[in-house]
């Protein structure tokens, strides 16, 4: 998965936290939360530096356990649904309505 840290609208996530989110998503143990789910990339972000998709998204959290339910917050990791490769990170912070903007990484 590599070590990619991201900054989503001023919230910093270490590569460990990013990888934890992907691992939680792949485990399926929190699927009752509705995540992970397909990310269709309606915004047209370019994730090709990291992967080609198809994409899934999962909430990013700073807590040691990562997202395990409840409010998903504004930030998401996007990963390749075939192999779990990190693709990118997106956030509702700074976007209009329910849209996303890309995080920096």
Curated annotation (Swiss-Prot):
Residue pairs linked by disulfide bridges in the UniProt entry: 8-103, 51-87
Catalysed reactions listed for this entry: [RNA] containing guanosine + H2O = an [RNA fragment]-3'-guanosine-3'-phosphate + a 5'-hydroxy-ribonucleotide-3'-[RNA fragment]
Active-site annotation: 37, 57 (proton acceptor), 92 (proton donor)
Primary enzyme class: lyase
Modified residues (Pyrrolidone carboxylic acid): 1
Coiled-coil annotated spans: none
GO molecular function, one term: lyase activity
Keywords assigned by UniProt, alphabetized: Disulfide bond, Endonuclease, Hydrolase, Lyase, Nuclease, Pyrrolidone carboxylic acid
Annotated SUPFAM superfamilies: Microbial ribonucleases (SSF53933)
Stretch forming the signal peptide: none
Keyword set includes Plastid: no
The UniProt record lists the keyword DNA-binding: no
Homology family: Belongs to the ribonuclease N1/T1 family.
Name of the featured protein: Guanyl-specific ribonuclease U1
């Amino acid at each position: 998965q590599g070590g990619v840290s991201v900054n989503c609208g001023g919230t910093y996530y270490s590569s460990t936290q990013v990888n934890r989110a992907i691992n939680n998503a792949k485990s399926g143990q929190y699927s009752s939360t509705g995540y992970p789910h397909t990310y269709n990339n309606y915004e047209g972000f370019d994730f090709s530096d990291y992967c080609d998709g198809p994409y899934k998204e999962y909430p990013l959290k700073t807590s040691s356990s990562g997202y395990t339910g409840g409010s998903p917050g504004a930030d998401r990791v996007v990963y390749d649904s075939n192999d779990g490769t990190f693709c990118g990170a997106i956030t509702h912070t700074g976007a209009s309505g329910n849209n996303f903007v890309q995080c920096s990484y």
